[in-house]
Amino acid sequence: MTFDKLPIGSTVGIIGGGQLGKMMAQSAQRMGFKVIVLDPDEACPCQHVAHDFINAPYDDTEALKQLGERADVVTYEFENISAEQLKDLAASYNVPQGYEAITLLQDRLVEKQTLEAAGASIVPYLELKDAQSLNQAVEEIGYPFM
């Protein structure tokens, strides 16, 4: 997969307007990009720094399409968005991060298994299905655990 350099003055669309979105927007602006943000909270931190703002829920298909149409590239600030909707967005618009990582990040067990398979050092974990598996985790991992 190859990506062309985004020309200065292009518009970056960000799904999510929290603190991370705000920092992303400010960095993009310092590099000469315009920023449009989609967030359900009209008082979100990013709303005050973005060039344009779409006030809509993250799962609003029409709002996501509007963001895709108005931005040269679309990114997201967190994993709490629908991987399926992100997949649909990436099929028609420039979403270089894709949706695959979101799919992994939304299931913490799959996330840990994927990192472990890739050779990353991670803390011990067990899948908790019921009270018995919780007791097993206490015995095998010990306290504290999350």
What is each of the regions a protein language model found here?
Residues 104-146:
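Active-site nucleotide/adenylate-binding loops and adjacent lid/helix of ATP-dependent enzymes
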